[in-house]
Curated annotation (Swiss-Prot):
<feature type="transmembrane region" description="Helical">
    <location>
        <begin position="111"/>
        <end position="131"/>
    </location>
</feature>
<keyword id="KW-1208">Phospholipid metabolism</keyword>
<dbReference type="GO" id="GO:0008654">
    <property type="term" value="P:phospholipid biosynthetic process"/>
</dbReference>
<keyword id="KW-1003">Cell membrane</keyword>
<keyword id="KW-0472">Membrane</keyword>
<dbReference type="GO" id="GO:0043772">
    <property type="term" value="F:acyl-phosphate glycerol-3-phosphate acyltransferase activity"/>
</dbReference>
<protein>
    <recommendedName>
        <fullName>Glycerol-3-phosphate acyltransferase</fullName>
        <ecNumber>2.3.1.275</ecNumber>
    </recommendedName>
</protein>
<keyword id="KW-0808">Transferase</keyword>
<keyword id="KW-0997">Cell inner membrane</keyword>
<comment type="subunit">
    <text>Probably interacts with PlsX.</text>
</comment>
<keyword id="KW-0594">Phospholipid biosynthesis</keyword>
<feature type="transmembrane region" description="Helical">
    <location>
        <begin position="1"/>
        <end position="21"/>
    </location>
</feature>
<feature type="transmembrane region" description="Helical">
    <location>
        <begin position="136"/>
        <end position="156"/>
    </location>
</feature>
<keyword id="KW-0443">Lipid metabolism</keyword>
<comment type="similarity">
    <text>Belongs to the PlsY family.</text>
</comment>
<dbReference type="InterPro" id="IPR003811">
    <property type="entry name" value="G3P_acylTferase_PlsY"/>
</dbReference>
<keyword id="KW-1133">Transmembrane helix</keyword>
Amino acid sequence: MNILIIFVSYLLGSLPTGFLIGKYLKNIDLRNIGSGSTGATNVLRNVGKWPALIVFIIDVGKGLIAVKIAQHYTDQGLIEVIAGISAITGHIWPIWLRGKGGKAVATGLGMFLALSWKVGLASLGIFLIVLAKTKFVSLSSISAAIFLPFFMFFYLGNYMHSYFFISLIVALLVIWKHRTNITRLLKGEESKINQNQ
């Protein structure tokens, strides 16, 4: 059962939401446009606001549902975490798109909302505050990732300490996926949310 949960979580994460929205609404391949990501930000810039919101909600749902499925069928915290990581892995490296997906910010948010809604909302709060101040989605995502392990430790303390280490791994993964954005930020070449790349 545990292996099945992990496999289903990966397939769930692999659902190419942004790619399908781009193809259906504008007949475009997001992998070849803008940032090349299939996430909500690239959808926003190349398809529109409402499609981007739909993609964001579904991508959050992928991480959340994966963990909830694990919580329903097992009481093993490790399997819950692996299910969430599997959904994130599927989102970044989807089997349907030959491994070219998104950056897992929304799916990661869904995962941590399911593990601890306080941690998830606190991280979302950091994202929104930085976005409001700077208009850089990438910087907002990186900032939320940096604060994530601290929120996990603050809200959970010694309880489920393994969650802290997983949050650290996810944070590092998100930052790594934004490495080209970091380079552009340092060069002053990064696009703001209302700018096309």
